């Protein structure tokens, strides 16, 4: 009888086998799209950025892209869990990513404390009264208070320049103020010519006359 080739997704190194039972499946994380193969090494690894939990896979399409927010920089993986999450402070909208470089930093003025995010919209803006010049931040602690004597109602601020100074005749001893309302008037009969004053001590007695 004619010899029968092992089918796609299988191989056999047995010479003179009387049965197809000697044809073994390629393992998960691999596929084989040709017949008559005689070595396990003939099985083709799923590429970087992909995985497959299918045993005996016959086509490359069995290899599934790692989800956005993850990447995989090596080949032949069997599990979705093998895909590596982008670090905190980063995100990636790309499916099937093959490099950590695909994970982009959250922009300055924002942070992200958890891993595996897939869009920039997941990055959390610093609240009003704070700012951060740090990109790729994994903690809200990088959002710094506007100093006393200033305030800001902007979210996601990237610079202390966003913090506006209390005007003349006013002061504020409160860091992280979110409104002009934090600026208090000098008491009756006193004035201050200073911008961004932090204390009532800057308020001087009005000159008689």
What positions do the PLM features span?
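Disulfide-rich, cysteine-dense extracellular ectodomains and adjacent flexible linkers of secreted
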Residues: 1-209
């Amino acid at each position: 009888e004619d010899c029968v080739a092992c089918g796609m997704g299988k191989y056999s190194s047995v010479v003179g086998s009387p049965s197809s039972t000697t044809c073994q499946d390629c393992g998960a994380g691999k596929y084989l799209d040709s017949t008559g193969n005689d070595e396990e090494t003939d099985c083709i690894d799923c590429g970087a950025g992909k995985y497959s939990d299918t045993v005996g896979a016959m086509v490359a399409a069995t290899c599934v892209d790692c989800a956005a927010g993850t990447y995989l920089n090596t080949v032949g993986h069997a599990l979705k869990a093998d895909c590596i999450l982008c670090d905190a402070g980063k995100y990636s909208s790309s499916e099937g990513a093959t490099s950590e470089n695909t994970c982009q930093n959250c922009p300055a003025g924002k942070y992200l404390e958890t891993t595996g995010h897939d869009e920039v919209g997941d990055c959390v803006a610093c609240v009003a009264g704070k700012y951060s010049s740090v990109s790729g931040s994994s903690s809200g602690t990088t959002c710094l208070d506007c100093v006393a004597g200033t305030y800001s109602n902007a979210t996601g601020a990237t610079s202390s320049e966003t913090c506006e100074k209390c005007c003349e005749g006013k002061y504020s001893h409160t860091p992280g103020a979110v409104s002009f309302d934090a600026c208090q008037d000098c008491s009756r009969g006193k004035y201050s010519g200073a911008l961004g004053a932090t204390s009532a001590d800057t308020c001087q007695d009005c000159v008689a006359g």
